[in-house]
């Protein structure tokens, strides 16, 4: 048989405030029922975690990253990208080619299609498990701002200040 334990390092400053910390703690409790010990280590020293990742000694880790509205996947997933070389170790010529094709185009619809293919490949590699999608909350006072002029579809990638020139103040 294989190992019946694994450590997952969480980059939450040792305070349990990383969004994945609670989910991993609950998963650890559930896995104990079937005899697997998932050790959740909330790292107070981020350098200790990145050193383990870079050395290839981390079983698993939970960190967060965000992308721009038109993300460039090179740094995270390309074979020669900075994060991939130390975190994922993906060496996939098809993935590399798709990433480079996307980098060479300014057509966002085309890039979106390529990025979808890239993410399908990454999912097949099973090197990461999406745990959450961050959402921001923005509050405006109707006494101070004409709400009809606020960006209608605010996302984490397109915020109200991207259309600040359209805002009417009361």
For each predicted feature, which ranges?
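Short linear motifs at secondary-structure transitions and domain/linker junctions
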Residues: 35-38, 105-109, 162-164
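Bilobed periplasmic-binding protein-like "clamshell/Venus-flytrap" ligand-binding domains
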Residues: 1-15, 61-64, 106-142
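Composition- and surface-driven signal marking solvent-exposed, interaction-prone regions
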Residues: 22-24, 43, 76, 113-118, ...
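A glycine-rich, aromatic-flanked flexible loop/lid motif
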Residues: 64-69, 88-91
């Amino acid at each position: 048989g294989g190992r019946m334990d694994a450590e997952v390092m969480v980059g939450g400053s040792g305070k349990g405030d990383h969004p994945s910390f609670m989910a991993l703690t609950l998963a650890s409790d559930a896995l104990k029922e079937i005899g697997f010990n998932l050790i959740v280590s909330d790292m107070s020293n981020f350098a200790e975690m990145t050193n383990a990742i870079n050395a290839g000694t981390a079983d698993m880790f939970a960190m967060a990253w965000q992308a721009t509205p038109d993300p460039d996947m090179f740094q995270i997933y390309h074979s020669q990208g900075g994060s991939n070389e130390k975190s994922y170790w993906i060496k996939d010529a098809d993935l590399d080619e798709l990433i480079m094709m996307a980098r060479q185009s300014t057509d966002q619809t085309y890039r979106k299609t390529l990025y979808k293919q890239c993410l399908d490949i990454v999912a097949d590699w099973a090197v990461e498990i999406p745990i959450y999608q961050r959402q921001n909350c923005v509050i405006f006072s109707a006494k101070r701002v004409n709400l009809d002029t606020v960006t209608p579809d605010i996302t984490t990638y397109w915020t109200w200040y991207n259309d600040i020139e359209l805002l009417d103040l009361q």
